[in-house]
From Swiss-Prot:
Active-site positions on this chain: 136
Entry's transmembrane regions: 10-30, 33-53, 145-165, 181-201
Listed GO biological process terms: proteolysis
Gene: htpX
Protein name: Protease HtpX homolog
Co-factor requirement: Zn(2+)
Membrane topology: Multi-pass membrane protein
Length: 286
């Protein structure tokens, strides 16, 4: 099995550089003092995101670690797949929510965690669960998780800077040589840029993880079946449209929000389920 971590390491580096440059540039718009503070903040943000990417997603989903006694099937499947891929065993978590979904997080295979919701464990059979876990492990082995978390952090920073720019433009844009027109531009374009970044990074990752996961398990049709069930299950039991969950939606195997909800459409980071299923069925046909 061939993994593709090197290209994603480069993308991660470029995103971190871009996030730092953006923070410093927006700091300059607020004036000299803000520029110095922004530079310090950029360094701190990079360090924090790198070492805490796993904790952010697990905390947002209220995920709890589980032992092999608590989740024997999950442990058995993950151990078999990790051994087959010659990779370390990740930490396993369960999130007690009816919303059917799963995600992986962590900056590298040795610091990875895989989480399933109780909802997905309830609706999938073991063959389908194996396919979903293979998909999530593929994210880990391809180093998708770090780039995804960095992209999410970058999007969050852009949104925060846009909010700061809006308030600064309203209540003090002329102090310390701040440029009110530039602040207004940041406020208007920031949320759009944040959404585009999430979508651009996440959609291509999902197709690749579908393919890599199907090769790892040798069963693309099982993943197609799982995606059908998850898609239907999300319509019946979506995650609540809360900002902290929306910021982690790009990590999930499928969009966790009900179709048509404002937050679900705004933060849609996944390719259409129908397209993913068609690709998997074509893969099964050879």
């Amino acid at each position: 099995m061939t993994w593709h971590p090197h290209a994603n390491r480069l993308k991660t580096f470029l995103l971190l550089v871009g996030m730092s440059a953006l923070i410093v540039a927006v700091g300059a718009l607020f004036g000299r003092t803000a520029l110095m503070l922004a530079a310090l903040f950029a360094v701190g943000m990079n360090v924090y995101v790198y070492f805490n990417s796993d904790k952010l997603a697990l905390r947002a989903m209220h995920a709890q670690p589980v032992s092999e006694l608590q989740a024997p099937a999950m442990y058995r499947i993950v151990r078999e797949l990790a051994t087959s891929a010659h990779q370390p065993m990740p930490r396993l978590y369960i999130s007690d929510t009816a919303a059917p979904n799963a995600f992986a997080t962590g900056r590298n295979p040795r610091n990875a965690a895989v989480c399933c919701t109780t909802g997905i464990l309830r609706i999938l059979n073991e063959r389908e669960l194996r396919a979903v876990l293979g998909h999530e492990l593929s994210h880990v082995y391809n180093r998708d998780i770090l780039i995804s978390c960095v992209a999410g952090a970058l999007a969050a920073v852009i949104t925060a800077l846009a909010n700061m720019a809006m308030w600064a433009g309203m209540f003090g844009g002329n102090r310390d040589n701040a440029n009110p027109f530039a602040l207004l531009l940041v406020a208007l374009l920031g949320p759009i840029a944040a959404t585009v970044i999430r979508m651009a990074v996440s959609r291509s990752r999902e197709y690749q993880a579908d393919e890599s996961g199907a090769v790892l398990t040798g069963d693309p049709l099982a993943l197609a079946s799982a995606l059908r069930k998850i898609s239907g299950g999300v319509q019946a039991a979506p995650l609540p449209p809360e900002p902290q969950l929306a910021s982690q939606a790009h990590l999930m195997i499928a969009n966790p929000f009900r179709a048509g909800e404002r937050i679900g459409s705004l933060f849609s980071t996944h390719p259409p389920i129908e397209d993913r299923i068609r690709r998997l069925e074509a893969m099964a046909r050879g």
